[in-house]
Amino acid sequence: MKTNKTLMLGMLIFTFLLSVKAQAQEVAKPVFITVTTMYRNLEADGKDWRKTEQEYFDKVTSKNDLIIGSEILTHYYTANSAEILHVLVYKNWDDIEKSGDITDDLIKKAWPDEAARKVFFDKQRSYYMNKHSDEIYTSQPFVGSKELKTDSKNPMIVYVRKSHLSMKGEAKYYKEFNEKVTLKNPLIKAYYPHRHAWGADGREFLEAFLYDSMSDLEKSREKDDELIKAAWPKETDRKAFFDEMDKIFTGFHGDYIYHNEPTMKK
């Protein structure tokens, strides 16, 4: 069972972003988000990948009360077409560690026969390459966030922007920008800002924007421009504000677009 436990702990460490209904009433309290980036095994027959992950979600993830949110994101426009992100959300750091024991118990209950359990996890493991990376983030509700309000079972577009903090500037300017622009943009269905807690780069600041379609993502830029001009109608005021806000970041950022798997969402 040690092997299975280690595998699943790795898979259960996964970003971004999530519509966590349980946290809707605690928007001011940061949560922990684990992100595991895995890679599809392109040599394997992946036709049952979704069915297998759905079974695991139904029998394990959905029943683990310490996991308060989950997402699986698949490549849409990213640098690696094999990329699959597994995202889990917890109330605190301790729950990340404790959830492993609960997951182990749920696995034994779902597949009590050891031989059947081995068959299932061998199949699940076959869908992925033998490499992954782990990151842990904390949500940043003080700069503003927007919870997803939909029961739709259609996949959404998840645009992830990874920026680098300069460790200069003042966060109040980004909070003001989000309040006047991001949170007022009706095309942005949800917005989740996160900051690095554990992983490769302590400067990383990650934002997840959810849209109904790629068309909405493209049109949202025009809406942002409209809201910016309404919030700072004078060009001099606008320039002064953005000069201050831009000090927060190094200027480097990366863009990633994914589809989510709505039936495996918690």
List the predicted regions and their residue ranges.
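Short S/T/G/P-rich N-terminal loop/turn motif that feeds into the first structured element of a domain
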Residues: A24-D113, R117-K266
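Bacterial Sec-dependent N-terminal signal peptides
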Residues: M1-K29
